[in-house]
Amino acid sequence: MKTGWYNDNNVFLVVKPLHNGNRQSLIVGAQQLATNKWNIFMGVFPSNATYNSVMHSSVWMAPTSTNKKPTAKNLFLALEALDEIEQEIYNRANGEAAIIYIDGIDERSLRVYTKVLTKKRGYRESLIKSEYVSNMQKLYKMI
């Protein structure tokens, strides 16, 4: 998928290439569930992945359900968060793609909490906290 913002049938995806030269893209998205909750997820996908393959790769979706509709603002915040923890993701994944999902977003303090689940470690969850200051505040005002 190309870098950008996708919106199709109440599914929102933001796609961004990773900087590791492995032809992978980081995708963060949200899907409305039948219960009117939102399934918010992130994952590392091959750059040639299609919209349908992302949406049908259930193994990649580790949900955090929320009643709050996701906004472009908080999805972009979550995506930017991964810039700061990208290396940590690869360290924990031992070279394999990690599954990441949003555990919580605190827009006032511009923090995004994510959980990383790695295949080689049996999907053991670990919490990573990422905090930002100036660049995130600029982004926050722009969106």
List where the protein language model places each region.
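Non-catalytic substrate-recognition and accessory regions of acyl/acetyltransferase enzymes
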Residues: 1-143
